[in-house]
Amino acid sequence: MTIETLLQNHPALIACRDSVESARDLLIDTYRAGGKLLLCGNGGSAADCDHIAGELLKGFLSHRPLSEEDCLALAESLPDGEADPDLYLLAGQLQGGLPAISLPAQTAALTAVCNDTDPALIFAQLTWALGQAEDTLVCLSTSGNSRNVVLAAKAAKTKGLRVLALTGENDSKLSELADVTVQVPATETYRVQEYHLPVYHYLCAAVEEEFFG
């Protein structure tokens, strides 16, 4: 999938081309540096976080077969070596992955924060605990002003992470904080989310192409 394909299928996103390309470059730089993605959002955007992580952790548009080096390492590490009955399954079906963590999926930790400190800190606490300087926090908020997401962005910046925001078209607290903001051309929640989907599908495809061909 190319940027041209994205814009041909969704002409309204032409105005976002520069920011989408900057987002792509940011994600590629993150993975080149050995970093990971942390993703946060509420409601439908929380589901989008799970969706994005799913596209990155395994094959999306390509199969991402293991390298010969990885297959050899498997054979050498299994108890029965090449005779191990699980070698064929592991070497043949495991896929290359790109590390991404959906923070809304961390139910036990989120509810602990809600119960023990402040519900507004659910994503900030996990970002603080999991984030490293080479990582990027991806914030999805249709308004760009969701308090728990904004607090996570502030925590991320303090720890040296970069921040990518996907929002609606209006300037927002997230657009002030983020290194890159993709402001899709809509304000209604469902319309913003409908634009976010093709944007992040393109980003996942572009990152996959960069690292797995």
Specify the residue positions occupied by each region the protein language model found:
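Generic N-terminal amphipathic, Lys/Arg-enriched alpha-helix
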Residues: 1-15
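A short, well-structured juxtamembrane/interface segment
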Residues: 15-33
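Glycine-rich, small/polar surface segments that engage phosphate groups of diverse ligands
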Residues: 30-130
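Glycine-centered short loops/turns at secondary-structure junctions
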Residues: 34-35, 134, 160
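Short beta->alpha connector loops at strand-helix junctions that form conserved
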Residues: 124, 141, 167, 182-190
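A charged, well-structured terminal subsegment
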Residues: 129, 192-213
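Short, glycine/polar-rich helix-capping loops at beta-to-alpha or helix-loop-helix junctions
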Residues: 165-178
